[in-house]
Structure formats: C-alpha cells, structure tokens
C-alpha cells in the first residue's frame, strides 16, 4: 500500500524552531492559519529548574497539552506517544496517516542523512511524516527547518532516528 496525504505543506517562521514549524504544518493541514494559531501564545516561559535537551521543549504552564498550550482558544490538542519499540511506533504513525492525519515525530538529527548533524552530533528534532510506501519500506518526511527536506526516507533510517540512544523526556 502507498499513501501520501494531500495538502501537507511546509510552514516555517524565522523566529521559531522545529516545534513551531511542525505544528504550523499540522494546523494548516487541519484548516487553521498557522501564524494566527501559533501567534496567539507567542511568549517566553520558563519553569525554574526544568531543563531539557529537546530543541522543541515548551513548558506548558497549566498542565494543558503541548498544542493546546501553544494554541489557546483553538479546538486543538496533542498527545505524546511513547511506543514500546520501533514497530509499534511505526504502526501508530501509519494508522494516523491512513486516517488522513500527518504526524509530528521526534527524531535524532544524528541519524538523519539530510540534517547537518548527521553522524556528528546527537540532537533531538521534530519532523512531519505524511505518507508511506509499504512495498518500498519508506516514509514521506517533511522538515521545514534548513536545510529544507521533503522526501522519502527508508523506514529503517526513520526507526533509527526515532530510537537512537539520545533520550528525551516529554
């Protein structure tokens, strides 16, 4: 089976990183204007003592989901999935794509051949997965952060990037 979702477009703002870029792509696909949605909560908030390694970390001030915190007043939310293994993780992503929803996926730049940190530096990052080809064992990936990437990754590469030794805490 081969599926590529229509209408998944890259979104990026110069003042934002991979978190906002991925969410901009996802909220636009859901029919919202990314800058209006994400700009509603454009702020700097820091929870004292809460240090994380994820580039995309955003402390949610009142326990709301990440997306609900970034997009107050909009009927959207998010949920982190922590799969038991790479296969379970891929099946979760695949199900969402089959349902018509692109997925933000946490990865390690060290394992992604299109990232400048490839095989050099471990760094948590987010990309959007919006398609797959079962026969070719590949996924369609979008990364609006320079250097821009919109293309096909072998599932083995995506699995390595999702399951690297670079641990994160969401």
Model-flagged regions — what are they?
Residues 133-170:
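Noncatalytic regulatory segments and standalone regulatory/sensor domains
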Residues 30-53, 85-141:
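Active-site-adjacent substructure of cysteine-protease-like catalytic cores
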Residues 1-86:
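Cysteine-nucleophile protease catalytic domains, especially the papain-like/related folds used
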Residues 25, 29, 96, 161:
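Residues that form generic nucleotide/phosphate-binding pockets
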Residues 70-83, 118-122, 142-148:
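Hydrophobic transmembrane alpha-helix bundles
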């Amino acid at each position: 089976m081969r599926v590529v979702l229509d209408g998944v477009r890259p979104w990026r703002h110069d003042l934002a990183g991979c978190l906002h870029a991925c969410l901009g792509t996802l909220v636009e696909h859901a029919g919202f204007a990314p800058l209006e949605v994400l700009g509603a909560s454009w702020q700097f908030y820091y929870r004292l003592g809460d240090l994380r390694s994820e580039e995309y970390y955003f402390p949610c001030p009142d326990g709301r989901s990440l997306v609900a915190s970034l997009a107050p007043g909009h009927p959207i939310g998010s949920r982190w999935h922590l799969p038991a293994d790479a296969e379970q993780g891929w099946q979760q992503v695949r199900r969402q794509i089959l349902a018509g929803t692109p997925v933000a996926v946490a990865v390690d730049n060290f394992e992604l051949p299109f990232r400048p940190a490839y095989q050099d530096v471990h760094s948590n990052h987010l990309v959007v997965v919006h398609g797959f080809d079962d026969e070719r064992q590949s996924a369609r990936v979008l990364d609006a952060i320079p250097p821009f990437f919109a293309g096909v990754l072998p599932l083995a590469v995506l699995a390595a990037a999702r399951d690297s030794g670079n641990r994160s805490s969401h």
